[in-house]
Amino acid sequence: MKGKIIEMRLMSVMMLLALMWAGCNDEEPTPTEVLVSSLSVRGEFIEDGGSSQMSVIVTPEDATNQKVDWSVSNQEVATIDETGVLTAVTNGIVTVTATATDGSAVTATKSIRVSGVQGPIVLVESISLSVEDITDGREKQFSVEVLPTNATNKDVEWLVSDESIAEISEEGLLKPLKNGSVKVKVEAKDGSGVQTEEEIVITGVADVSDGIVVDNSNDLLSAIANASPGDKIYLRGGNYAFGSTISFNKDGQEGNLISLIAYPNDSERPVFDFSAMSENSSNRGIQLSGDYWYVKGIDVFNAGDNGMFISGSNNLIEFCYFYENSDSGLQIGNGAANNTVLNCDSYYNADSSIENADGFACKLDAGDGNKFIGCRAWQNLDDGWDGYLRGTDNITTTYENCWAFLNGKLKDGSVGGGDGNGFKTGGSDDKLLKHHAVYTNCIAAGNVVDGFDHNSNRGDVVLYNCGAHGNGRNINFGTGNIANSLTIKNTFSFEGGGDSYEATTTDISNNGWQIGLTTNASDFVSVDIELLKSPRKTDGSLPDIDYLKLVSGSDLIDQGVNVGLDFSGAAPDIGPFEFEN
């Protein structure tokens, strides 16, 4: 019995040991693996020719294996190592790819721009310099061609041989300082030693040290507004756009004028362009209310009313052009006196109603002593010159060497609805006012209505050595409201309508229709009216033309009478031009 009990205890121990051994040999259960679902590549562009550290964001964050393999699309642009360091090889764009290594086959890409890689240095071999002479005294931009085209550094340095004659900028803009010759030199900056030079001649630089030079609208307006006696404003050529009236209201002094002058020798004229204006009687271009101004060499274009209105006195307007304005190109009024308009042109002035706008007008309430010398007026809708009075009386206006032609016609040559006279001497609402007028060496030609028009002017009118050709009526001083006096000497009239020469007192002698003379086209070198439009001389004076110049043998030669004008030969010739041998 006791033996069985011992045997049973041994079997229990053995079973317990067997169970313990089995428990010790069981493994832990293996957890489930988490795969990569997406990748996102991060990294900066290479701009210095160096390298950039690439990185990757793995989703999900608890992916079991987050290691990636790196690759690039073009190893000639950049290479990448196993840690994601991207190294530049040459300039360009490369695609970087990250690939998961957990068997998920997930990839991601990013395009990287590579720049700043320096290749082999290519030196400059030659420089070609493009320059030209300066004839107008203005700045000029020069240029160069640097070869080879793939030179590493194509920058150049600009130099001039004499900085007292000209200055030149880093970009090759040359600024003339005075007339003369100067060498322009260009040197390569890459250390190659390549250089070239060219000599240029500078002309057209004016001495403007006595004034200021302006080249833009704002500076111009400021200079005009702040002008003082003796100031000189030199205006560079070009277009100056304005939308409102410019007031010249400062006063100069006798012998100490305020001057606005086109910059000497510029290749283009300064144009006051009022195209932005609407047509309105208040929209004058320039309002000159100041005294003692000198304005030379400007154009006034497309004002909404007068191009220039002068209400000041003792002003000189020289070599200016007034065109395509909506009223008179230049008008004198409001008591303005003793103004001189010298060598100016006024043409193509017309309003939108096609019935108004003169070339020049000294009219309405103008003052005494105004003069027009060497001026031309053509194809103005109304009159070439208008002297109609309202609000003043007994004034005298003088005209010397002035040409009025084709007035009453528009720019396109068609006839408009204006009065169409060359010189309208005067007239008034009550037909009583006196506008005295003196015309010497003046021409009226091709005007639609009258060449020299009385228009009920009650003043004294004088014509010395004038010519009237091809007008509706050449000289028309009728019997109604006749002039106080009419003096005509050394003047011809031909190829026009019937003339009349009525006045209370007349002194009419030695003219082309008197003393047995007849005037016709055979007396002249040319009767082509279009020649009157010929360009002026560079100093602004009238052109030398053949129109109405006497031919040798004309019976108008030496048939005049001395009226105090210069002449050659035994006596003055008849007409505006002395015969030239």
Model region roles, listed by residue range:
Residues 401, 435-546:
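Predominantly extracellular beta-rich ligand-binding scaffolds that present long acidic/polar faces
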Residues 213-215, 237, 241-243, 250-304, ...:
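Right-handed parallel beta-helix/beta-spiral solenoid domain characteristic of secreted/periplasmic
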Residues 25-208:
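Extracytoplasmic soluble-region selector
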Residues 536-581:
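Surface beta-loop-beta hairpin patches that serve as ligand-binding interfaces in beta-rich domains
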Residues 236, 261-263, 289, 296, ...:
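Feature marks extracellular polysaccharide-active and adherence modules
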Residues 82-83, 171, 245-249, 255, ...:
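Extracellular beta-strand/beta-solenoid scaffold signature
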Residues 206-247, 573-576:
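Acidic Gly/Asp/Thr-rich repetitive segments characteristic of extracellular carbohydrate-active
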Residues 228, 250, 255, 267, ...:
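Parallel beta-helix/beta-solenoid
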